[in-house]
Amino acid sequence: MESAVDRHVFYISDGTAITAEVLGHAVMSQFPVAISSVTLPFVENISRARAVKEQIDAIYQQTGIRPLVFYSIVIPEIRDIILQSEGFCQDIVQALVAPLQQELNLDPTPVAHRTHGLNPGNLIKYDARIAAIDYTLAHDDGISLRNLDQAQVILLGVSRCGKTPTSLYLAMQYGIRAANYPFIADDMDNLVLPASLKPLQHKMFGLTINPERLAAIREERRENSRYASLRQCRMEVTEVEALYRKNKIPCLNSTNYSVEEIATKIMDIMGLNRRMY
């Protein structure tokens, strides 16, 4: 197999480009290629399309290697301009639409911005997601213990183990009302579940992390502090993991997982319904 080489990748759309970016990234992750990527949303007029084409062509002229272009473009005139570029262009949506068209025996009715746009059909879901984000922000890091019974999941863990980004991802991606509660150094002498949380134990999910990784993360925040010392991190992780075992709280070591993977595993283990937006 050839060694990895740098490739320039463009994710282009006449909408948000989220679909092109996500699917294109998923495809590129299958190959041992180091990439330099550019995401270009809302390419929805001729002048912008021509500017994008020039950008693609400039990369080709500089490197002599065709840039990889993943696009999702409904407007034919815009699509044609991109296809005239020196890039290797792949329509990531059409690759799925064509066989589905045959299977369903229906013609698609493409509309720009449809995937992530607001319309009367998804407005209620959108409002629910915003409400979930508001709830999650209000219940981040133990800020408020009010209305915890409304949470769909309560994440527990030591400081800097990934509770906040995971909670926000659950809220933003799936509309999950996620609270999180931190265990701090002062708790460690007699670590127990707070009385206010005990009735909600069925909603709890614990995060843990390798002490070495935790120390490295904390060191970036508070250099040469007791808080970031490996000894302190080992002690906190040991105590918190013992608490999880004692109370039979499901948990996950977040060390080698991305936020997306952590959130997905929590959804699966806790039996939470996935609501895509």
From Swiss-Prot:
InterPro entries: Kinase-pyrophosphorylase, PSRP
Record bears the keyword Transferase: yes
Principal EC category: transferase
Reaction catalysed by this enzyme: [pyruvate, water dikinase] + ADP = [pyruvate, water dikinase]-phosphate + AMP + H(+); [pyruvate, water dikinase]-phosphate + phosphate + H(+) = [pyruvate, water dikinase] + diphosphate
EC number, as in UniProt: 2.7.11.33, 2.7.4.28
UniProt keyword annotation of GTP-binding present: no
Pfam family, one: Kinase-PPPase
Residues binding ADP, per UniProt: G157, V158, S159, R160, C161, G162, K163, T164
GO MF, any single term: phosphotransferase activity, phosphate group as acceptor
Keywords (A to Z) from UniProt: Kinase, Nucleotide-binding, Serine/threonine-protein kinase, Transferase
Family: Belongs to the pyruvate, phosphate/water dikinase regulatory protein family. PSRP subfamily.
Biological role stated in the UniProt entry: Bifunctional serine/threonine kinase and phosphorylase involved in the regulation of the phosphoenolpyruvate synthase (PEPS) by catalyzing its phosphorylation/dephosphorylation.
Record's protein name: Putative phosphoenolpyruvate synthase regulatory protein
